[in-house]
Structure formats: structure tokens, C-alpha cells
Amino acid sequence: VSGSVLLQWIPALFAFFFGFSMTAHIMALLFVVICLVLLYVFYHPATAVSSTAPTNDYRQLLRRNYAFLLLAGGTFVLFCILLSTHTILPKDDGLHVGQCTYGDLQMHLGIITSIANQQTFPPYYSISPWDKLCYPFLCDSISSSIYLFGASLRYAYMLPMYFAFFQV
């Protein structure tokens, strides 16, 4: 979860100064790297004298949770299949989406492309160009970041969902 928060907020903080651009994202990356280096240098956890936890016995952990891992893995595969077959499929007669994404998808795709293309922060609403966006758009800013770095709109929309699935 903290990774998603970092992907949303750190580029957003630098976007106030540099716009929602590659420069803001590179500055955000440098900020996170500096924080990690400082944490590595100055953080010294107290070592425990004795530990009752098993030491790296992953086989036993897998055996005890085999049914759960099998069900979770199968559910993730089903989620991936459904997401990839319901999200912006190019066909001969246009773009197709699944019924479950038919209503909300257009708004989110508009927000994703607006944030990446406008490179202003906070972004303007693409339907009413002189109005600031009054919607919780940071959830779409991760997809905007991926889209800004050259991914297709389809994959920029889907990739954060795969990681969000594991956070639930």
C-alpha cells in the first residue's frame, strides 16, 4: 500500500513546482532514493537476543497455506483474464469494452490522458477546459505517470489494477 501512496503523492508534490512532467517524476524518484539511502545509513534496528520464529522455513509455510495460495492464484489469473478481455479492445469497427466498464471507463481515461497531456497541476477538467478538476484524481495519476512514460493507454490503465488487486 505504501508503494501506491508513494506513486500517487510524491510525483504530485513535485508536480506543483515542475508540472506533471518527466522532470517532476525524476525529481520524485531522486527524492525517494535519497530517503532510502538516509534510512539505510541512519536506521539501526535493535537486534533481538533470541527469536522464537522459525528461520526461513518457507516449505512449511507453503504446505500450511497451500489451499489459500491455490485459490488466490486462481482468482488472480481469473482477474487478469477478465481485465484483459474487458478493457479497450481494438476491433475492426472501433474500440470495445466490457459492460462492467462501459460507464465509468471514459471518464477515467479522459482524466488519465488530461493529466499526462496537460502537464499542469492540479489538472483542468478536459470537458470544461477552464475549470480545475474537482474529482479525486490521484487514483488516476499512477496511470497518468505510466502513460507519460510511453505506455499505451490500455496498459497504463490496467497495470496499476494488477498491483491494486494484491493490496485488497
Q: What label would you give each PLM region?
A:
Residues 1-62:
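Membrane-embedded, hydrophobic transmembrane alpha-helices
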Residues 1-2, 18-29, 66, 126-131, ...:
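Membrane-entry segments of alpha-helical transmembrane domains in multi-pass membrane proteins
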Residues 61-82:
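Internal/C-terminal transmembrane anchor helices
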